[in-house]
Amino acid sequence: MDPPSVRSKITEIEGDLFHAPDGAALIHACNCQGSWGKGIAKAFKDKYPAAFAIYRSHCQNLLSSPRYMFEPDLQSEESHARSSRDVRLPEGTALIIPPQKRDSEANGKKHWIICLFTSRGFGRAVSPPDVIVRNTELAVADMTRQLAELQTDQSSREESVGELWSCRFNAGLFGVPWERSRRVLEDAGLEVTVVRPHGG
């Protein structure tokens, strides 16, 4: 008999992601090109320009000085594929951006921004859905690891990550059915409030 898997507590609500409580971390999926040009990414860029500058710089550094990580041969329930590959960073990773003073002053709340790098490109160059799901598995695992490190290191920080809030990432312009990404989140063992727009 298989041991029970750790399931996270996913709560889905209708509303505005940006109304998350002070100190919350807002999770969304990103491309690796440094562009938040459409969809919810554009809303993030408009609301958190200082965080966008950090994201863009992170992408530009890795575009100009490529680095890779080796993804071992693994098969998940979700990806259905077995193959090893070299993944060009930041693809398959997470970037956790602490609240930026300029953004917090403009918005009245301190929000952490978590970028999950799930697609290499965007628009016509968006990665295929199965690649996005595999990258989501890697990025959520990386996010979970980084959050654990931040939690153990919080004694030396003024601010710690509060609640985790998320949009239905990958389901918009990346075109991956939400259920596939939700399954990855459920397997991560985290408590996340997922916000969908009113009527969405």
Swiss-Prot record:
Positions of the Macro domain: 1-200
Annotated binding of substrate, by residue: 15-17, 29-31, 36-41, 169-175
Annotated SMART domains: A1pp (SM00506)
Name of encoding gene: poa1
Name of this chain's protein: ADP-ribose 1''-phosphate phosphatase
GO molecular function annotation: ADP-ribosyl-[dinitrogen reductase] hydrolase activity; phosphoprotein phosphatase activity
Family assignment from sequence similarity: Belongs to the POA1 family.
Classification via PROSITE patterns: MACRO
Reaction equations catalysed: ADP-alpha-D-ribose 1''-phosphate + H2O = ADP-D-ribose + phosphate
Gene Ontology CC terms: nucleoplasm
Source organism of this protein record: Aspergillus fumigatus (strain ATCC MYA-4609 / CBS 101355 / FGSC A1100 / Af293)
Enzyme Commission number, as recorded: 3.1.3.84
GO biological process, one term: purine nucleoside metabolic process
Gene3D superfamilies reported in the protein's UniProt record: Leucine Aminopeptidase, subunit E, domain 1 (3.40.220.10)
Disulfide bonds: none
Alphabetical keyword list: Hydrolase, Protein phosphatase
